[in-house]
Amino acid sequence: MSVQQMRVEITKVYKGERWRLKVLRMTDNQVIAVYHRFVKDGLIKNY
């Protein structure tokens, strides 16, 4: 999964516009870390 795909998936976890903008401003490493945390916590289904 690419970082851009991870970014899209973590954007879906919370519906707010502020969250979406925060995700868009995250570095690639932050996106990867948040994605793996959300998978671990069961907020995102790992494909």
Where do the language-model regions lie?
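Basic helix-extension-helix modules of the SAP/HeH family
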Residues: 1-47
